[in-house]
C-alpha cells in the first residue's frame, strides 16, 4: 500500500492519491494524509477534473488516523 503525505492534505497528496487510484485501481491500496489537515483545495479538484479524475468526495485526513502497519511505502510531497 502507498501513503501520499503532505502538510495540509489539500492539494498535492490528494492529487497524487487520485492519480494513483486511477492508474492502479484495486491492485494497490492508496491513501493520503497530512500533518496539519485542512480541506481539499478547490483548484486541485478542478485540475483533476480536467484529466477525468473526481476528487469531490475526498476529504483531508490527519496522518494520526493512518495505521502505520497498513503502509508499505510513504511518499512525501
What are these regions (language model features)?
Residues 66-77:
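Mid-chain, well-packed structural core segment of small domains
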Residues 1-67:
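Conserved active-site segments centered on acidic
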Amino acid at each position: 500500500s502507498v501513503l501520499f503525505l503532505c502538510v495540509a492534505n489539500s492539494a498535492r497528496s490528494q492529487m497524487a492519491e487520485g492519480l494513483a487510484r486511477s492508474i492502479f485501481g484495486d491492485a494497490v491500496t492508496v491513501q493520503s494524509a497530512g500533518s496539519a489537515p485542512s480541506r481539499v483545495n478547490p483548484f486541485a479538484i478542478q485540475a483533476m477534473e480536467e484529466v477525468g479524475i473526481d476528487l469531490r468526495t475526498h476529504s483531508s485526513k490527519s496522518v494520526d488516523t493512518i495505521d502505520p502497519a497498513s503502509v508499505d511505502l510513504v511518499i512525501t510531497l
